[in-house]
Amino acid sequence: MSKEKFERTKPHVNVGTIGHVDHGKTTLTAAITTVLSKHFGGAARAFDQIDNAPEEKARGITINTSHVEYDTETRHYAHVDCPGHADYVKNMITGAAQMDGAILVVAATDGPMPQTREHILLGRQVGVPYIIVFLNKCDMVDDEELLELVEMEVRELLSQYDFPGDDTPIVRGSALQALNGVPEWEEKILELAHHLDTYIPEPERAIDKPFLLPIEDVFSISGRGTVVTGRVERGIIKSGEEVEIVGIKETTKTTVTGVEMFRKLLDEGRAGENVGALLRGTKREEIERGQVLAKPGTITPHTDFESEVYVLSKEEGGRHTPFFKGYRPQFYFRTTDVTGTIELPEGVEMVMPGDNIKMTVSLIHPIAMDEGLRFAIREGGRTVGAGVVAKIIK
């Protein structure tokens, strides 16, 4: 068994528990690590080790999150669990812990509750692609019909937010009994693990996606032309390939005639690397920070979108006062700030620090964007909010 730990060949998948307060998310997290460590190696984590989650900072926002890891026969999982509802909201909006899939925990004794709905909605808005349901505390419900009713309610709720409710795997279990080592309930954790392995597809790695490089700096090198620098966000760029320059201005095409790193010429630049790309025939003044280089036809510039936003509280260094419709802050995408105006949902007059809210944004310049792109909201260089593009309008 001990040899298992050093195998880095298994695909890596990011998951997390979501759901209403006290429905058993943390107990389930502990149960998964405990049961799977018996079967596939790895470390068991006790409830209280997970529950006192350390504080982290993501984009200046304080979030309490616990990270655990576990293995199944075919995969390695990184799993996040948050103690408080506000932590989930912040986590999902900032993308601090990107999830390839989520385990929605619903207590069979209660059925779906307000945060159950809110977490499903957030999952939809921020692009959590797959949800598996763990119906918890089933040891406390004798009535088969009641279980079926709760299951039906959960499926309806998922369908309401465009998840495939009818096809979603639902496991009936008891996290506490599994944690206590009761075999019939341990079996349910293995069933959950099986669904994780089969229902959540292996995520596409950044390197396999189409090339994208957010431009941080632009230089002109006499006799050679214009060089842009930045960190490759996804994909690979090779010398000789055609790229588009997208955002802020009209989209144009150019050819990359050289890729360098630390002043050395490379054959290619790969996701995660900081590179300089030499562009053929592009003038220094035609290109600026905030644009992106991308594989032609893979990303388009937009100004108007629907977003899900978390507004920092005063304690987090955010605003001390609410804002109203017509608010005009800067929206920081990748490497640059763009001014934009906001529209609030009908019936919402103002937004308080610490709130999360759905808002429609209209930028003064187009930015290269996809649904799921994260941004910060800033006033004079200070971050006052974090958001994610939920739906592109134009």
Swiss-Prot record:
> Enzyme group, top EC level?
hydrolase
- Tell me the segments the record calls region G2: 60-64
Q: Quick one: where's region G5? A: 174-176
Record has Cytoplasm as a keyword? yes
State the GO CC annotations: cytosol
Reactions mediated catalytically: GTP + H2O = GDP + phosphate + H(+)
- UniProt similarity note: Belongs to the TRAFAC class translation factor GTPase superfamily. Classic translation factor GTPase family. EF-Tu/EF-1A subfamily.
Subunit details for this protein? Monomer.
| Descriptive protein name | Elongation factor Tu
Question: What are the top taxonomic ranks of the organism?
Answer: Bacteria, Pseudomonadati, Pseudomonadota, Gammaproteobacteria, Pasteurellales
